[in-house]
Amino acid sequence: TRYHCVTGVQTCALPIYEIMGGKADPIQISAFLTAMTMKGETIEEITACANGMRKHGIHMEHDKDVLEIVGTGGDKSNSFNISTTASLVISAGGVAVAKHGNRAASSKSGAADCLEALGVKIDLEPEKNKEVLEKLGICFLFAQKYHMSMKYVAPVRKMLGIRTIFNILGPLTNPAAATMQVMGVYEEALVRPMAEVLSNLGVKRGMVVYGQDCLDEISLSAPTSVCEIKDGTFEEYVITPEEFGMTRCTKEELVGGTPQENAEITKEILAGKKGPARDAVVLNAAAALHVAKEIPMQDAVKLAEELIDSGKAQKKLEEFVSLTNKLAEEE
C-alpha cells in the first residue's frame, strides 16, 4: 500500500478503499489522514471518498423521505449534544429523522454516547431500526454497526485527536441515504463545498452551517454562515440570533461534559428549562424544520419552541427509549 501522492480523485479514493478494506496499517492511515488534513480536500475528492465509504457500508432500506442533522465535530468547542437534542424536536414535528452518529472521536460525548446515556438502545439491527423509524419517525444509526470498516480507523482517529477527513465523511455517509440534511462544519471554507458535495450525493434540500465563533452548529454567540441547498441550487447568506428574538450568549454557556452530563442537559431542555442551551437547540431544530417543511425560518423557530413547550419532544424521547429497549430485548 503506497500513498505517494495525496492529490486527485483517484489517488484520494484508493486509500479510502484500502483503509475500509482493512489493507492499511495504523501508520499508513495516520499518514493519509494527517496529509489530507494539511492539504485540504477538494469537492471531487470528498465526494469520491464518501461514495467509497458508502459502498463499504450497510444500507438501511426504508420508504420515507428522511432528514439528517449532524455536525462534523472537530471544532474543539466541547458543546453539549445540540444536534442530537434537536433531532428529537424535529421528529416531534412530524419530520422523519435518521440520525447517524458515533461515539466521541475528538470530543467527550458523541451522539451515540449521549443517546445511550438517555436510555436509548443505540445498536439495533437495521431491520429493527427500520421498525423504529416507521413507528416513531426517528431512529439512530450507530456508525460502528453500519460502517464496520470504521474499526480500522477509530483507534487512529482517537490517537490523533485532530479533525480529519472522517469528520467530514461521517455526516456524508448516512446509511438511510437522507435526502434532506442540516450539516454543521468546523470552518467557514467548507460551507459552500460541503453543500455541493451533499447535492452530489443526492440531498435535495439542506443547509450547511458554520458558527463564526468556530462552531459546527448554528451559533447563539456569533453570526452563522449558511449555504442552503434547493434542488441543485445554492444560496449563501448569514443569520444572527437576534433575527429570531434570541439573546446572544458566550460559547462557555453551551459547553457540555460527560455523556451523563450532556444527557441531563437534554432532559432539562425537553422538560422546558429556558436559557441559552434551549435557544441553541431551538435554532438548530428550526433550521431542519425550515428545510423539511419549506416554511420561513421565523415560523420554524416558533414551531420548535411549541414542540418543546407542549411536551411533544419530551414524549418523543420517552417513546424512543421505550421502543428501542423493547426491540433490543427481542434480539
What are these language model-derived features?
Residues 10, 25-26, 42, 83, ...:
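Helix N-cap / loop-to-helix initiation motif
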